[in-house]
UniProtKB/Swiss-Prot annotation:
It is found in: Cytoplasm. Keywords: Cytoplasm, Methyltransferase, rRNA processing, S-adenosyl-L-methionine, Transferase. It comes from the Bacteria. Belongs to the methyltransferase superfamily. RsmJ family. This is Ribosomal RNA small subunit methyltransferase J. PANTHER family: RIBOSOMAL RNA SMALL SUBUNIT METHYLTRANSFERASE J. Its main location: cytoplasm. One of its GO terms (cellular component) is cytoplasm. It catalyses: guanosine(1516) in 16S rRNA + S-adenosyl-L-methionine = N(2)-methylguanosine(1516) in 16S rRNA + S-adenosyl-L-homocysteine + H(+). It is an enzyme of class 2 (transferase). Specifically methylates the guanosine in position 1516 of 16S rRNA.
Amino acid sequence: MIEQQTGSRIRVEALAVAGQEQAEHWAQRLGLPLHDAEADFALQSTDDGLQLQQLGDDAPGAVRVDFVEGAVAHRRLFGGGTGQMIAKAVGIQPGVRPSVLDATAGLGKDAFVLASLGCELSLIERQPIIAALLEDGLARGRDDRDVGSIVARMHLLTGNSIEIIRGWTAEPPQVIYLDPMFPHREKNALVKKEMRLFRPLVGDDMDAPALLEAALALATHRVVVKRPRKAPCIDGPKPGYALDGKSSRYDIYPKKALKPKAVTDDSGA
């Protein structure tokens, strides 16, 4: 059963007749009730997929993972390709598409960008509700003609990122990407609805220093930490350098240079 924070009671419900079976599946899997009149959130099964809706007055709109349409799809088509700062941060360059572990996957937006540029991605999300949204979005994306091949490069793991990284037995990723949620100081009322919706569920990643330490021990080439542009670095080792954007900053912890894979000559010459 999910350990729910104070003020974050969640129920599961179907908004379409055909979604009742799926709602029952998620309720059983997540240990959540199908009926709770006092719930603060509803995980809803709809014709368009799984979504999370905050309940009550002034609640932001529902959030779901959609790699086919909307903002994520627009970014894939018009977002700048390999010229994007995130691409530079993880080391994408001609002949280099590093394997990346996104240890704070969230809704998978950054991971999808990297997968669309040719990287193989492992994703870890520890909050079960967010992981459910991401799993549902990945399943729908795999069935889409346009993005199916991209989503096929994204492999989801659910659990505590630090524990998974420390117990990693597969080939180590070349790059580990972190975007931890830190104590909220933003005064702007136009904070993204995902942030407004998830903060009561997720809280702050107070174990970010331990996550950085684990990531530095596993990544073979670099660790990348995404931060608000004016925010302090994570406590611990200082980054080697940073890439600054208008609102975000990427702190780079280099370990080894990323180089193009050598092309072998099989011609027999």
